[in-house]
């Protein structure tokens, strides 16, 4: 199952961007034997400001995918439950899993309503760059849990 972290905005050479890329690479390497991956980060930018314009550039990337939108009102899952959910999606035959991270103002309601589900990293608000790194780390952690690796400790 291919996993895409689809994000609005480009982080360039920020340390958080490099951290996210590192975790995505680790998840890709660790997930091969589990039929999970590759894990990629795709950055998109709208030509006009606003959530509606961002929705237009996100929409083409969502076709045929199981979509989980990161949103402050989403479901909070502990790491092990998150891993089990990713494993279930794979086992149910989903070929593509896309996680969405919106811009500074979040995701357009039209995108949120088309997502299969929403995910939150707790009740706090996180900077975009940190949310991306945290999501990439959680995907890596999920892969290691599915693999039975000692990376995650309960």
Curated annotation (Swiss-Prot):
Catalytic activity of the protein: pseudouridine(1915) in 23S rRNA + S-adenosyl-L-methionine = N(3)-methylpseudouridine(1915) in 23S rRNA + S-adenosyl-L-homocysteine + H(+)
Sequence positions that bind S-adenosyl-L-methionine: 102
InterPro entries the record matches: Alpha/beta_knot_MTases, RlmH-like, tRNA_m1G_MTases_N
Superkingdom of origin: Bacteria
UniProt-listed Enzyme Commission number(s): 2.1.1.177
SUPFAM superfamilies to which the protein is assigned, alphabetical: alpha/beta knot (SSF75217)
Compartment(s) of residence: Cytoplasm
Keywords: Cytoplasm, Methyltransferase, rRNA processing, S-adenosyl-L-methionine, Transferase
Gene Ontology cellular component annotations, sorted alphabetically: cytoplasm
One Gene Ontology term of the molecular function aspect: rRNA (pseudouridine-N3-)-methyltransferase activity
Pfam families from the UniProt entry: SPOUT_MTase
Role, per record: Specifically methylates the pseudouridine at position 1915 (m3Psi1915) in 23S rRNA.
Family, as annotated: Belongs to the RNA methyltransferase RlmH family.
Subunit structure: Homodimer.
Protein name: Ribosomal RNA large subunit methyltransferase H
């Amino acid at each position: 199952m291919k996993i895409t972290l689809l994000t609005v905005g480009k982080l360039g050479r920020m340390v958080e961007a490099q951290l996210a890329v590192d975790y995505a690479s680790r998840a890709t390497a660790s997930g091969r034997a589990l039929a999970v991956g590759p894990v990629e980060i795709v950055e998109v930018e709208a030509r006009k400001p606003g959530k509606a314009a961002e929705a237009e550039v996100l929409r083409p990337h969502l076709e045929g995918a199981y979509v989980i939108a990161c949103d402050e009102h989403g479901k909070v899952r502990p790491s092990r439950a998150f891993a089990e959910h990713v494993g279930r999606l794979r086992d149910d035959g989903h070929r593509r899993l896309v996680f969405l991270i919106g811009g500074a103002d979040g995701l357009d309601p039209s995108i949120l309503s088309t997502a299969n589900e929403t995910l939150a990293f707790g009740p706090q608000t996180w900077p975009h760059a940190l949310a991306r790194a945290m999501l990439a780390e959680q995907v890596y952690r999920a892969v290691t849990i599915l693999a039975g690796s000692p990376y995650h400790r309960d």
